[in-house]
């Protein structure tokens, strides 16, 4: 059970919450702050003060005063009218993440909701009732209005949820769990939907998968080095310390550890003086992607604990301030950066695939075919990798450079952060498939070299891979092989976390 405080949530905790289904509870001190802040909102309503989002309309209607008797209707109308999401739903892990992050930000005690609302969000998390939230429709400022409205709907007993493996109406799940839908009161609708939790939840899942994929890329690249009898000198510690980037030094160190007892690597000048860049520059390129990942993780952990709704309430109600923390620009930039960093791992992987299958670049059978000419072997797998890499280049175009005004030009600059976050996740799926193709080719090359000559670690990794796909002894439908390896990489926890060379043994 992970305790939410509004201040301390980490990526490591989100891994447990999203991937392992761990439950959550609220810090009592934080809940006390929620209750105290709520008293301020109720006094504002009682006194008839004019405060945006509490006693006024929204967006362009911010100058429209709402009567006390209409305050509840205002919140309900807000949720229904803003539930304009379209397209396929976010993965369940993302909608679960949205619930967690929305609760966490409310626990900062500046949003003005009742403790009841926070508790309801936590009930949904712990009972694994996950909102069906369409992926498209958010501009990323005023936060993720459309996606979060679909989240808010289910608290009211409306909309759909994923529950026990099925997609059902929210009331089906609430009834089975013995829960009553809530009725929103002043400010609560706005507090639920005015924030960056959709782009951030998708960003967190994307980061978790990207981190795992980056580690896996080092295993796979190491096996390719063996298949091509790569020069190990290029990974010498002195070379990388001379550059000074810690991530580059770390990648080189991990690859040295993986290959330390390999009989398939060579020394400088033995077979050739230098390797091509796709082998020789693995630490420099992969290390640069790790720099991106480290940046993204830092920004996500800030946003996971950020108050991003509007207005915010401070100093016991002395200050009720309309600001712009809902603007998703920091996450939009981070997700666009993640797109570029991950796409580059696929770029260099595809070039290693080419070196594995091109007979002009190695002494292996052409396209790793068991019978060159009669059988095409891995020829078209390289085409598939090239296609995915090309698609990534389109997806990597920054979403954050775009902005379209909305709400009659009141919201005249937006982040498009949710588009960036969604595209980052698509790129990661493509990267994983490119790496799967490289792994299939690298395993085949290793067989031609003699698997008994592989390092202890890569040999173990090879045998795990061969449990997913057989050796290429005849042409077959390789699409299935690629998807099998990709699924294994996505779900295999022994290589999903930090690269421990002993974990593969």
From Swiss-Prot:
NCBIfam families: hutH, PRK09367.1
PTM: Contains an active site 4-methylidene-imidazol-5-one (MIO), which is formed autocatalytically by cyclization and dehydration of residues Ala-Ser-Gly.
SUPFAM superfamilies the UniProt entry points to: L-aspartase-like (SSF48557)
GO biological process: L-histidine catabolic process to glutamate and formamide; L-histidine catabolic process to glutamate and formate
Catalyzed reaction equations: L-histidine = trans-urocanate + NH4(+)
Gene it is expressed from: hutH
Pfam families: Lyase_aromatic (PF00221)
Entry GO CC: cytoplasm
GO molecular function: histidine ammonia-lyase activity
Stated name of the protein: Histidine ammonia-lyase
